[in-house]
């Protein structure tokens, strides 16, 4: 409806149908050369072999085998970050390396291969970010390869364990440091921002509400 077009801007069924046509037109050659291994592949993998309570779960959009026999993940992403010269803005393309989601999916894939839940006789190539531009007047698609690197994945695992330990300490000591860089993001502002502005010292906020 016209109202929905206003509310959702370029994100509406008519635009999705047009995008699907152009997506297939531009990328059919790739799809014909690749073999689909899995779609919407769920996973739940441990992060610490000594503590089974710590795990990482998610769902991989697609797993494919390319023409060289390598295993790749396909992660679909949409964006409104339009560039007249490049199609996608440079900062959008660069946002996937380093990227905790991409690196986490690499870690999960290695574990699934180790458990023989994904083909373990194939080399793991990495992740293709299957990007689609959402724009009123333009169509643009790009597959951004992020190549697997074992040192990158090891660093991701160290980071996750560090933040898990930090959160556990905060929970135990009831001390949670501020994270000002999270106050504003592309999704809007934190719903608790007014609380921080009204009472900067959270330690002074009583546990019980006032009578």
Language model regions located:
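A non-catalytic, helix-rich entry segment at domain boundaries
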Residues: 1-47
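Residues embedded in well-ordered secondary-structure elements
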Residues: 28, 51-52, 179
